[in-house]
């Protein structure tokens, strides 16, 4: 019986370590996306006028920067929670385990949806900047602000990877949540056990 408990404890520790690594990667990717797009500026001369491209020129990019920064902060807090639970609260029962698991599950889902939605909205705005919209007489901007567009593309890649990682973390949260509920299935009859 003790070998089973030791194996279960080792499995929980490995799962916590994997979740921590994934949360750390998501935090780094989201922070990189926020910094790449948030600190990005480029000044060019267009028809004898100096124009400066910033993240605030495109509302979707500004929202992406704020959402990615919030996601990075959230993942950092969850990483600290994972660290605390794996180091200091190992084996101690918690009265509010289900409530905490539900909260983590819902926050992970919300973070995944928001990160994905803002990344896709920013990508759509970037497609307009890349190709222009002739019906609205919007010209291409990426041939003028090349470095700005390249950095935005890099931030979109980081943000999309963070969104995929956050979706994986929501699966982990769902597993951790529903593990707390007992199975409703009855055990198989003894004739099937063999």
Curated annotation (Swiss-Prot):
Membrane topology of this protein: Multi-pass membrane protein
InterPro entries, per the entry: CASP/CASPL (IPR006459), CASP_dom (IPR006702)
Keywords associated with the record: Cell membrane, Membrane, Transmembrane, Transmembrane helix
UniProt key word Transmembrane: yes
GO cellular component: plasma membrane
Cytoplasmic topological intervals: 1-18, 81-109, 173-194
Transmembrane segments: 19-39, 60-80, 110-130, 152-172
Extracellular side stretches: 40-59, 131-151
Entry-linked Pfam families: CASP_dom
Subcellular location: Cell membrane
First-listed, main subcellular location of the protein, grouped into a coarse class: membrane
Subunit comment: Homodimer and heterodimers.
Stated family: Belongs to the Casparian strip membrane proteins (CASP) family.
The protein's name in its UniProt record: CASP-like protein 2C1
Organism whose genome encodes this protein: Oryza sativa subsp. japonica
